[in-house]
């Protein structure tokens, strides 16, 4: 143990699984501290009451189990969608976007219970340790963060199970062997990494995909879906108004049937290494395509292009755990301002893994049929294009003449 001020009470991000159950007991022993557990329902699809029973069995008296699905989608996913945020051109940031909310609630519960520390179960190799801790420190710079995987010597499955058995911690039969891969899930996505997925040359086995049906087995008939937006946020599906979490749940169900949202990606982690992940984001893939579709007819060209320039920076900040940073908030303010007229409906076609926008309509549309028609019109004089081209060509002509004068043929 370090010479730091002793910890009296710690709030643990607790799933009820083997790892965090061991961490709970380890915190009690190694720090001689009272442990408060916090379990979040972010739409991961797991029964959460077992976490309560396990925490009670471990002697925990303050147990927080919270349904955060609406807050998660409304306050974290939707702002990300307004930004069209995609990391390294492909990744829809499903794990990254869940961490700020968990960090926020850890801090809030610590304040409410008088805890002087929080703890998480992220390993010392991944991005999540960074995301959790940057979030905590941004909200309370004086709160201590404990990361057991960076402190203890329980560095194998065998040691974890032995520790659990020595301390009377329940170990499910299916947890005694080494899991073939690790899974993280929430309402936005499911990610699978490690073990059988570590060789990027090998195709992922069918058992990896838990959120989506195989595109090859999807219906032979396409399905059409209409999504309505107000100020950049999705508010209805097929004419039915619904809350953010309910809407995303509906899109997840549609995407699952049609095999939408699968991604096999090797990404650059913030901590320096490359990692291979299998991501399933069925509803998110549909929603992102729809949002792009409504922006196509409602955003001014300059605003649209500026957003596309800002998006990679926004996505990088989110991926690296800087959700609560001033620069992310500055970008968000600009992005949100751009969305005031992003209102209307988008019609999409789902078919065997693909999502295609096939229709868009809006009272705020900037699309003018009178101006773009190939037929004869009275609003646009094509002769005007000549002066426009000459002005834009001037610098290119001057460059070309200099090359000719100096004999530069390249």
UniProtKB/Swiss-Prot annotation:
One of its GO terms (cellular component) is cytoplasm. It catalyses: L-citrulline + L-aspartate + ATP = 2-(N(omega)-L-arginino)succinate + AMP + diphosphate + H(+). GO terms for biological process: argininosuccinate metabolic process; L-arginine biosynthetic process; urea cycle. L-aspartate binds at residues 123, 127-128. ATP binds at residues 13-21, 40, 121. Its EC number is 6.3.4.5. It is found in: Cytoplasm. It is an enzyme of class 6 (ligase). The keyword Kinase does not apply. L-citrulline binds at residues 91, 96, 127, 131, 182, 191, 267, 279. Pathway: Amino-acid biosynthesis; L-arginine biosynthesis; L-arginine from L-ornithine and carbamoyl phosphate: step 2/3. PROSITE patterns: ARGININOSUCCIN_SYN_1, ARGININOSUCCIN_SYN_2. HAMAP family: Arg_succ_synth_type1 (MF_00005). Belongs to the argininosuccinate synthase family. Type 1 subfamily. NCBIfam families: argG, PRK00509.1. This is Argininosuccinate synthase. It comes from Maricaulis maris (strain MCS10) (Caulobacter maris).
